[in-house]
Amino acid sequence: MKKLLCVIAALSIILTLSSCKESDSKVITYETEALPDSVDPLIASNDTELTILYNIFEPLLLLESDGSFSCGAAESYSLSDDKLTLSFTLRKDAKWSDGEAVNGADFAFNLKRAVDPSTRFAGSTALSSIKNAKAIMSSEQSPEALGISYDDGSLTVYLEREDSEILYAFAGPAGMPCREDSFDAAGGKYCMTKDTTISNGPFALSRWVKSQGEETAKFINNKYYSGPRATNLGGVYIPLKKADGRLDRLKNGNIDCGTIDSSEVSSAGEKNQLLSDYCSSVVMAFSSAENTAFADDTIRKALYFSTDRDNIQNALPQFYEKAGDIVSPDSVCCGKLWRKDSPLTLPENTDGQFSDVFSSAKTGLSEKKVTSLSIAYETDEQKSVVNYTAQNWQKLFGIRVDTVKSTRSQIIKGIKDGSFAAGLISFNIDGSSAYSTLLKLCAEGGGIVTDEGYTEAVYSSNKTLESLEAAESSLVEKCLVLPMYYGKKYYVFSSDVSGQSLFPYSGTVDFTKADLL
């Protein structure tokens, strides 16, 4: 009997080792060209950094594709009846990639960093409803004053006002942990090298080479991870190479997946698989600066209505998409699909219905002695888009229209002071959150919109899906912002890869569910 038990035990060990070996051998090669400098949750920004970040870290909550939330590092969460206290209970078995336990202090430390102005976290405005957060962000109080409490197994967040969008913050970088001792020991290089990066997600960073001639990164199965996103993959190897020839390398079996330019989509081949996501929303913003011609509603309306949206597809590279909204399609807000029942109404100059407006504007421009107008743009790609509008304005108003290439900050400044009549501005889209896009339009978030009514609606403690949709509509009704087109990013996968998807929050590849034949 003892011999039989020994044989069974031996077979069990062999099968276990065989299974581990099979999993370890499944390493996907994902090629991209963007060099990762930091995978610090509060600093990471380019596509490669975010791909690594969301695979090696796990936030308190996980955003699902339908806009709902599930538990990540949190075992459970609850919101008080008055909607001012958010409580998280942490998973008892959660560990860092070095085997240390994850606790409430780790999430608290990251939140304090997120609102600390010295961190310059791009998503800090989404945390402004937490007690004292605004005062901390304006350097009036210390990060230690942030309205949170914690112990080893929990984190509690106290809000100054009801915030229907606060859960999104905890499904992203602000909801990820940062261990203070590791942060301090890194000496300013936290999450900038393999040795200064520890994480709590299904993968852990195992290689990061930044030397010339070999720029690579690799993350492998985190043996200490026991959460809801356990993976069958052994890891993901990320060689950094220019995009030239990437499709050939994929077809020849040298790589398994990678990013491709929109112009290459049609060449990807039937056997290969494509995933895409919206990465930017490009709008035409219009000046309403006081003491300028653009403060005149009729003049601004005429410029707005004569902006050429019809020729966008002719002006743009293939696979860009004409926008019907400032917010990207399939976005969610307040737990619901954005504009499912109330599509944004955009102006269309059909049958000459705005001829009176154009005539009045032409007279107004003449009376104000306006002899030229300027439209600004950020990139060479955008020039052809603004050229169509410039031609329209010249024909309608009989004045010279210049197109000016400028920096984003100078375009925003020029629209605010009236140096530019309008400017083409691109905003990055963070996954499927409509609210994050609306925040980026606000001047407080570094955006272009100074309209008080819009800002008040976006930051309101009583905001709802309907009130936010109305706020967006007001930008169109006041002729301040006109949706133009969406930028998209594309990922191509060989037929040997299955189960791949994109993280709804970041729009980057989720390798936790992927498998390799």
PLM region descriptions:
Residues E31-D81, I198:
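N-terminal lobe/hinge region of extracytoplasmic solute-binding protein
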Residues S76-A126, A293-A295:
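Aromatic- and charge-enriched surface segment that lines or borders ligand/interaction sites
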Residues S124-S182:
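Surface-exposed binding/hinge segments that line
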Residues L159-T231, D244:
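Gly/Pro-rich hinge or "lid" segments in bacterial periplasmic/extracellular proteins
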Residues F219-S266:
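Ligand-site clamp/hinge motif
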Residues E290-G335, V385, E472-V481:
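Periplasmic-binding protein-like
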Residues Q313, D402-I411, Y435-S498, L517:
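Extracytoplasmic/peripheral linker and loop segments enriched in polar/acidic and small residues
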Residues P317-G364, E381-Q382:
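Structural transition elements
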